[in-house]
Amino acid sequence: MNEQYSALRSNVSMLGKVLGETIKDALGEHILERVETIRKLSKSSRAGNDANRQELLTTLQNLSNDELLPVARAFSQFLNLANTAEQYHSISPKGEAASNPEVIARTLRKLKNQPELSEDTIKKAVESLSLELVLTAHPTEITRRTLIHKMVEVNACLKQLDNKDIADYEHNQLMRRLRQLIAQSWHTDEIRKLRPSPVDEAKWGFAVVENSLWQGVPNYLRELNEQLEENLGYKLPVEFVPVRFTSWMGGDRDGNPNVTADITRHVLLLSRWKATDLFLKDIQVLVSELSMVEATPELLALVGEEGAAEPYRYLMKNLRSRLMATQAWLEARLKGEELPKPEGLLTQNEELWEPLYACYQSLQACGMGIIANGDLLDTLRRVKCFGVPLVRIDIRQESTRHTEALGELTRYLGIGDYESWSEADKQAFLIRELNSKRPLLPRNWQPSAETREVLDTCQVIAEAPQGSIAAYVISMAKTPSDVLAVHLLLKEAGIGFAMPVAPLFETLDDLNNANDVMTQLLNIDWYRGLIQGKQMVMIGYSDSAKDAGVMAASWAQYQAQDALIKTCEKAGIELTLFHGRGGSIGRGGAPAHAALLSQPPGSLKGGLRVTEQGEMIRFKYGLPEITVSSLSLYTGAILEANLLPPPEPKESWRRIMDELSVISCDLYRGYVRENKDFVPYFRSATPEQELGKLPLGSRPAKRRPTGGVESLRAIPWIFAWTQNRLMLPAWLGAGTALQKVVEDGKQSELEAMCRDWPFFSTRLGMLEMVFAKADLWLAEYYDQRLVDKALWPLGKELRNLQEEDIKVVLAIANDSHLMADLPWIAESIQLRNIYTDPLNVLQAELLHRSRQAEKEGHEPDPRVEQALMVTIAGIAAGMRNTG
């Protein structure tokens, strides 16, 4: 274990040293000394030296405005480098990676050792594997793309430096390159000056595909195939690619007025353009590689006399011409030119697949399997995974927008006001119209801009090549009519196929009603005919936690899934649960393997569909090797969950969860909604007001510009509490509820739940992780610097609650200290705290100065504002999850 850490530690200190030299060259010895002093004080403050903690606070309070930015940047950049070293560590032979691709092998061995599972059953489970990762542009991806590229290169240098056999001159060359990269990062502004547009966000997503997934996915499939051959003597069929990528960037318009129908149309074209670009590079390689002459009669018939001399090349060159023509047409469309579609325009995956697969079959038949299974196989798998659209997109819109559009329409038609009808009347109207052959939208109707936007979006979906849009997600879905309304709007737009429409249930009440809503829908004959035995439902993690606290929300999510699984099973419907998880614990984030095994039995039968949030995309898919490791983890977890499902919880456990849920929700809402001091305390003790100024994502932080906590999006709500280290949304209410159940004499039952029920043990594990990242002395310091004295008692009360909560969680989990079973994560948090603490202290100081200036009617000092932005980004890097 310790060897593992020492490799990580030595890389971290080496990168820190290079950063120090860079700072000295850029700003002189005195700034470096300042930074070093602060680092040493922080280290001994962490070790429990109170005098040094006091000195740390004084030193940071007394920095001049000129010193603020360099000090903030030094610690922030250091944390980015530490994260890079840790990311490398997770794939390095000395680090975690020694164990990750092995996940699949370990899972297969575990499954083979179960007497009740035949090899055939395991094969069938592999064949029905389905993993769809939905990339979302979260404003929380704070790091700029420019810096991400540099960090990828730093990673490559670390990898080469690990090679024991490199010559001295190579070692010196690599160190020089590292110095250059770290200097480039230091002299680059880490904060974006402008908010990214939705198109910028989509380009960020394409960059992830190009830099990592394009190579990572075929590598993962080779790894999977190797393990299956070794353990089951089973070869993956060429056409079997269980992983797909979808994106919300450019498709998610919920609360984001910047994502319009035109933007979605543009992103769809851009995505296809990027796909032609990447496939052209692949085909170029194949043109030079596939110079073979021998071919099957089928292939020769396909190429005719003209191509007989070099049949494979001939087909590849043809495909290359089609790709080039397609790319040129897409480029013209992106510039706004209207051109007729060229001969051979590629719109469907089959058009890419057929010539490539014909070559593959011919090479195999002619004894050239070794060639067929090289680059050609990788390209075939990319066609299955990415294809013509590159990534498909989801459209997401809030339910009320559809209701308002239909209300405006029915008023215009003089048949009443749809918005004020009862649910039964709405359903009757919708089903009648869905069954009708005549159009509903009048020709000369001029709807309002909002309604026009909803109709235009449906038009874009109807015109897009089939297969480029994956699903229509309805946020804040509450009733069956919410789902039927979207089907009607799509029908009116002339859509020619059954588009999956997924209701998203995201508040406590909506989760509790989810099963009723779906049961009603499945009882409608027209609806059953439309969906052809398949239904997708999305479970919202972040909004339900913000609404009711984590304990109540996670139990509601579990119960909703459990009920939906049983209802769909009874109705013979294949259910795909779509999980809207975030990177942070308050938004449902948990280590993948634990999270999947803690879901109700049967929840992964229809495959896994899950959102991957901005900042987590980089940690999980930032490099091809990490992609292989993340996909392997998911694969192992899905196989295990489907073949060895977790137990059904005992009735007594369910009753305890009901009780925990009620107590924790009451306490959580008692503070967040009913305590009149809470909102003023939240606004002053966290950088919530200042966060709005950060040019992070393309969507506004609030659903409505005025309003309290409930109008704040889930992301800034959690982000703000992560910054001041109280981490409140991720624990408030949970420990108090546990304590109450312990006092009722049920501790041994809770211990049994922790031991034998993955759902419950994952809950507790996530609480431990949050407590390990929280820091009460820092939260208290924010209060002293920023909060009105009258509100101090509330802060004290919340901190005392957290201390009590930690005790009860440790007692139930039977641990002496936090994260006892995950020492690697505990180590990583400790390593970063030394650098995150000064940023927290500095942030409190900067907020104090900035608010003081505002109070006195002065413009805030730009140096203070800039340094504040840097601390926000730095703490996010230190906490490894933002919102």
UniProtKB/Swiss-Prot annotation:
- Annotated active site: 138, 546
Entry's EC annotation: 4.1.1.31
Q: Which SUPFAM superfamilies match?
A: Phosphoenolpyruvate/pyruvate domain
Gene3D superfamilies the UniProt entry points to? Phosphoenolpyruvate/pyruvate domain
What protein name applies here? Phosphoenolpyruvate carboxylase
- One Pfam match, given by its short name, reads PEPcase
Q: Which reaction equation describes what this protein catalyses?
A: oxaloacetate + phosphate = phosphoenolpyruvate + hydrogencarbonate
GO biological process assignments = carbon fixation; oxaloacetate metabolic process; tricarboxylic acid cycle
Establish whether keyword NAD is in the entry: no
Family the entry assigns: Belongs to the PEPCase type 1 family.
Which co-factors does it depend on?
Answer: Mg(2+)
Q: Which UniProt keywords apply?
A: Carbon dioxide fixation, Lyase, Magnesium
Q: Could you tell me one molecular function GO term of this UniProt entry?
A: phosphoenolpyruvate carboxylase activity
Q: Which GO terms describe its cellular component?
A: cytosol
User: So what does this one do?
Assistant: Forms oxaloacetate, a four-carbon dicarboxylic acid source for the tricarboxylic acid cycle.
